[in-house]
């Protein structure tokens, strides 16, 4: 019941207020990250007073907590620019920052250009599939359907291929607007790697990388940009880091895994994907997209994200302190943001890599 003297907003007004609230949440997340993290792109190497880093927007919400906790514990300031994985790799390669952050491992060409850089897994999360379909709260999607949408071959939400895997759901005859990252992005890498494992056509025609030539849709910069676009656009779909989905209140699709189950990007399912890692290669490159069917509850677009750091760095001591904090005490900040703790085998590999810097 409304309080005396108050009137209820009409339904259309309520929807407008709700949408504005979601957009405000996304903006506030961006502002919060910016106020703690953002530095000028191309900033000079950090002085002895602290560290600078740049890269992944996926890890940015967790990074904000790491930075705050590390500064309180050690008194060492850290600045971070959430500029995307591709830009982060470029900046650490140019040595304009002390560390890069990327959800995609270095390619052989990038590793060579970075000159003695080491990639260290330091966080574990997922790329979710956010959607804005009026009246639809729960949605199942398969890799084949997602490939069809981003190929531009599935264009309506009531397409039979979508309806078949969503029995009982009333799907509207609404045009689908696929949204993709316009900047170099680890989320793009993870999403397109999953599609490449599912669809031979996608693998041969598009492939996977931090930037690819999407066949359909509209581009948006950063996780905040793609989230905002999906929230504002009826019929839109986009691949978005799980923590941004939480902040925006967007619906997340349950995605089909190799066992044929449709799973959400929650902690339990991310951990199930990561549990398939039994060993870590020397270069620390780990892929957990579309894991084996034995991981029956795994979310299939889960990913590790990496710190990219050079050997014998000017700030070696501070870097080792910060990296060790991130992979140990810093993991406690993750659960509220849909970051799962590193599995023991990965944690061990990360500690070993840090010790060799």
Per-region residue spans from a language model:
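Short intrinsically disordered, low-complexity coil segments enriched in acidic
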Residues: 1-3, 30
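Short, Lys/Arg-enriched N-terminal segments with co-localized hydrophobic residues
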Residues: 3-22
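Intrinsically disordered/low-complexity terminal segments and short unstructured peptides
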Residues: 6, 24, 53-56
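Short stretches within intrinsically disordered, low-complexity N-terminal or propeptide regions
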Residues: 11-13, 34-36, 46-48
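N-terminal export and membrane-targeting signals
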Residues: 18-32
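Bacterial N-terminal signal peptides
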Residues: 30-40
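Flexible loop/hinge segments at secondary-structure junctions
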Residues: 46-357
